[in-house]
Amino acid sequence: MLRACQLSGVTAAAQSCLCGKFVLRPLRPCRRYSTSGSSGLTTGKIAGAGLLFVGGGIGGTILYAKWDSHFRESVEKTIPYSDKLFEMVLGPAAYNVPLPKKSIQSGPLKISSVSEVMKESKQPASQLQKQKGDTPASATAPTEAAQIISAAGDTLSVPAPAVQPEESLKTDHPEIGEGKPTPALSEEASSSSIRERPPEEVAARLAQQEKQEQVKIESLAKSLEDALRQTASVTLQAIAAQNAAVQAVNAHSNILKAAMDNSEIAGEKKSAQWRTVEGALKERRKAVDEAADALLKAKEELEKMKSVIENAKKKEVAGAKPHITAAEGKLHNMIVDLDNVVKKVQAAQSEAKVVSQYHELVVQARDDFKRELDSITPEVLPGWKGMSVSDLADKLSTDDLNSLIAHAHRRIDQLNRELAEQKATEKQHITLALEKQKLEEKRAFDSAVAKALEHHRSEIQAEQDRKIEEVRDAMENEMRTQLRRQAAAHTDHLRDVLRVQEQELKSEFEQNLSEKLSEQELQFRRLSQEQVDNFTLDINTAYARLRGIEQAVQSHAVAEEEARKAHQLWLSVEALKYSMKTSSAETPTIPLGSAVEAIKANCSDNEFTQALTAAIPPESLTRGVYSEETLRARFYAVQKLARRVAMIDETRNSLYQYFLSYLQSLLLFPPQQLKPPPELCPEDINTFKLLSYASYCIEHGDLELAAKFVNQLKGESRRVAQDWLKEARMTLETKQIVEILTAYASAVGIGTTQVQPE
């Protein structure tokens, strides 16, 4: 508030000093008591004070204009030649160029096309800033609003107005200076008209563009999804084939180890075992071949998927980045899974290769040993060769055995020497092998690290792309919000201008029209007013009579209808009462369904009656209720049984307790009837007193109070009286509903009889 007051004061001072409206008036003619010297001194003081005030106002205006650019704009628009004063003192305004003044015309508004708006909106912010800095201010000032509004063209559904002077696009004129619009430009800008597109057209174009982009995004997402589905299917098949190959290689290795370990098995079993090994080898080769084929297919599909993703990136469809990022993540996961399975297959094949080499060495050693035996014992029968030593122990002679033992000693010595040499040689081989293994492991480790780094880099790149996309979306939303606000402000300004112009034109037209029509209207009113008054009076009189007749007839018909319904309801309720009271020894209860249906049929449009009839217990409708006489007769039997089991609580005590309770009922003689007190004490709440109170109430016709006393019973006495209490409750509920219906029917009947005389 203080700032507004200061602003208004400074503005007024600036207007007074710059426009020349502040006039120093001479003082009133004073009396001639003062000398001429004092008069000159007073005039000088006034002039000095005026100059000081004017200078202070100008200085304050300049200082405030330097601090607030909006105030400078308003002063430059309001006070002529103030812009030159500000430019001399403060310099040119930064990013603040006054729009050329032009008269508001009633012609259509001009607006830049959607294609121009979209082209300008797609420029990056850096280019826009560069264009703003390089282009002269007089050329960028008219198009600045169009650039601001065009950037929000994707989301706005309102027209994007913009002023497009013809000469504003010609930036090659050297006469146009920064911050100074030339007079020719101002005249041409003032003569150019403003055209505004209809909001429906702009909204339709934007909706069509959004629809096309959405269709492109959907088609791209569908193609990526189909390619991912196909690649995932082939990759899963390849992974399954690799797992099957691992299982086949491991099975063959296990069977081969078992065959080599069990060397003491008989011939037929051994041959069967080796046939099993051959079958496992065939299965292994088949599984490995299938795994290799599946791996090649999977690699081809992965390469195809990579090409599909690259093509999707090259299309540069707006909004498709999340789909591409998700597809890249899934592709990366498939590649990692496939690499892991391939590593498992390679490890299994390495282990199987070691087992195969071990088997070849064992077979070679056995063959060498057989050849040595053949050379040592040539006289041994051919049929004995190949048999075990235990089988040949009884068939060989002493010389043969001695020669075999001597050969065995020589062979052992030879093998010991070879073993020592082999140990020395193998130490060197092991050292070389360890170094070679270290190099191989280092290379494998380097390759694994490189591959892991590549996977990690791809994951980091995907995460970075996702974060960049999120930040870009947030910044675009913020930019669109700001641009939408500026566009809305510009649109509101144009709307206000058009509203003012419309009001001026409308007031002028209405004034002329009112002047021309006032005379004819007054004359026509004089002639028609009398006829209208007479006709209105006659119509009102006739209408009042007609309304009175209609109201009387309607009230009489309504009263008769209500009286008829009340009478029918009363008759139906009386029939229901009769059904409740009618009973015999053969039929103690009569179903009340027919009587209740009659009440519902007679009062089908009465919600109160329908609610009461719906509250009647269903068992009363189907079976009926016992009358009070029947309940009184049943009560005495229930009372007798309840007194017999008065000592039994809810836990149903032992048979001895039952006997004591029965004995108590025989020995005690409580009064059959006791008048219930106004308030029950804790001493009154026992089975005998409660039954005496209930008997008194039943004898005096108060079934409801008797049911309340019976409801206070506990233990076995309450269980004995449960059926009687249920029937009494049903009878009381039905009786209460019938009484309410009777009272309602009587009230409605009385109301209709009071309405009839009217």
From Swiss-Prot:
The modification Phosphoserine is found at S103, S112, S113, S223, S388, S390. It is found in: Mitochondrion inner membrane; Mitochondrion. Keywords: Acetylation, Host-virus interaction, Membrane, Mitochondrion, Mitochondrion inner membrane, Phosphoprotein, Transit peptide, Transmembrane, Transmembrane helix. Residues 34-45 are mitochondrial matrix. GO terms for cellular component: membrane; MIB complex; MICOS complex; mitochondrial crista junction; mitochondrial inner membrane; mitochondrial intermembrane space; mitochondrion; SAM complex. The modification N6-acetyllysine is found at K211, K222, K451. The chain crosses the membrane at residues 46-64. Residues 167-178 have a biased composition (Basic and acidic residues). Residues 1-33 form a transit peptide. InterPro entries: MIC60. GO terms for biological process: cristae formation; inner mitochondrial membrane organization; mitochondrial calcium ion homeostasis; neuron cellular homeostasis. GO terms for molecular function: RNA binding. The keyword Transcription does not apply. Residues 65-758 are mitochondrial intermembrane. Residues 116-143, 162-200 are annotated as: Disordered. It is a single-pass membrane protein. Component of the mitochondrial contact site and cristae organizing system (MICOS) complex, composed of at least MICOS10/MIC10, CHCHD3/MIC19, CHCHD6/MIC25, APOOL/MIC27, IMMT/MIC60, APOO/MIC23/MIC26 and MICOS13/MIC13. This complex was also known under the names MINOS or MitOS complex. The MICOS complex associates with mitochondrial outer membrane proteins SAMM50, MTX1 and MTX2 (together described as components of the mitochondrial outer membrane sorting assembly machinery (SAM) complex) and DNAJC11, mitochondrial inner membrane protein TMEM11 and with HSPA9. (Microbial infection) Interacts with human cytomegalovirus protein UL13; this interaction alters cristae architecture. Belongs to the MICOS complex subunit Mic60 family. Component of the MICOS complex, a large protein complex of the mitochondrial inner membrane that plays crucial roles in the maintenance of crista junctions, inner membrane architecture, and formation of contact sites to the outer membrane. Plays an important role in the maintenance of the MICOS complex stability and the mitochondrial cristae morphology. PANTHER family: MICOS COMPLEX SUBUNIT MIC60, MITOFILIN. This is MICOS complex subunit MIC60. It comes from Homo sapiens.
